Amino acid sequence: MPLHHLTRFPRLELIGAPTPLEYLPRLSDYLGREIYIKRDDVTPIAMGGNKLRKLEFLVADALREGADTLITAGAIQSNHVRQTAAVAAKLGLHCVALLENPIGTTAENYLTNGNRLLLDLFNTQIEMCDALTDPDAQLQTLATRIEAQGFRPYVIPVGGSSALGAMGYVESALEIAQQCEEVVGLSSVVVASGSAGTHAGLAVGLEHLMPDVELIGVTVSRSVAEQKPKVIALQQAIAGQLALTATADIHLWDDYFAPGYGVPNDAGMEAVKLLASLEGVLLDPVYTGKAMAGLIDGISQKRFNDDGPSLFIHTGGAPALFAYHPHV
C-alpha cells in the first residue's frame, strides 16, 4: 500500500500511540469464537473515542487554513461533537455546535447529562435546531453567520466523515494489520456504520492490507439501501485521494438499529450489559451496543463467512450511558 500518499496529508498528533488490540477471553468462551477488540474508546482526550482519528487530519487542515473556530453538528448526545469541542479547548480554539434532539425526548438526563454536560465544560457555543435535515447546508449557513461576527470558522462535517477525516481510519487499518501480524489471523472485523467515515476508511485500508478479512458494518441509523451509497461514495473519494483502487464490496447489516438512531433497543442494551459483566468493557446504547448485538447475533445465525477470529472496533461512546438512564 503506497504509504507516501497517506503521509502527504497534514496530521495533528492527538492520540500518540496505537490503541490496544485485546483478546476478550470470557466473551470468546460465551460465544464459542475468538473475539478481539480494538480499543479506540481509550484515546486520551475527553473520555476517549474514535473521532480523534478523524480530527487529527481535519483539525490539522483547519490550523493550516488559519481557523480560530471549529463548527460541527450532531445529536445532543453526539460523541463526535464532544471530542471536537475538547480538541478545540485543548488548542485554544472556539467551538460552535449545531445540535438536534433526534429522539424528541424531554428526559432531563438526555438533555443535560452525558456528552451534553461535557460540552458546557469545554465552553462550547450551542446552537439548537429542529432537525439536521441538510447538515452540510445548515453548517455552511452557520459558518457564514459566525464569519460575519469576525471569526475564521472551519466546518467539520457530521461525524468528521469526509474523505479527509476518514484518512484516520485508513491509518487505523495499518495499525490493525501491524498489531495482528504476529498475534492473530483475523477472519472478520465488525464496526458500527453511521456517518460512514470510519467504515469507509477501514474498507479502503483493509482491502489493501488484509484483503481476505470480511468487514461488516452494522448500521445504527439507516437501512442498507440508504447507508450503502454513503459508504461507497466515501470509499471511492478516499481511494481517489490516495491514488488507490477500491473494489471491495461494502457489507452492511441493518437488522439491529430499530426503532431508530439514538433510540435504545433490547438487543443493544443486552450487549452493553453483557460486555460490562463479562469483560468490564463499557459500550453505549447508540453505536457500539447495537454493533455488538450484530456481532453476537451474526455468530448465532452463522452470518459470517466462517467461524474464525473476529475483531470488534470499539469506537467509544460510554459518556452517553449517563444520558440514557434509566434504560441502562
Swiss-Prot record:
Record PTM N6-(pyridoxal phosphate)lysine, positions in chain: K51
UniProt record, GO biological process: D-amino acid metabolic process
Protein origin, superkingdom: Bacteria
A Pfam family assignment: PALP
Cofactor: pyridoxal 5'-phosphate
Keywords from the named record: Lyase, Pyridoxal phosphate
Record bears the keyword Lyase: yes
Record's catalysed reaction(s): D-cysteine + H2O = hydrogen sulfide + pyruvate + NH4(+) + H(+)
UniProt feature coiled coil, ranges: none
InterPro entries assigned to the protein according to its UniProt record, in alphabetical order: ACCD_DCysDesulf, D-Cys_desShydrase, D_Cys_desulphydr_bac, TrpB-like_PALP, TrpB-like_PALP_sf
EC numbers, comma separated: 4.4.1.15
GO molecular function (one): D-cysteine desulfhydrase activity
Assembly behavior: Homodimer.
Physiological role: Catalyzes the alpha,beta-elimination reaction of D-cysteine and of several D-cysteine derivatives. It could be a defense mechanism against D-cysteine.
Family indicated by similarity: Belongs to the ACC deaminase/D-cysteine desulfhydrase family.
Name of this protein: D-cysteine desulfhydrase
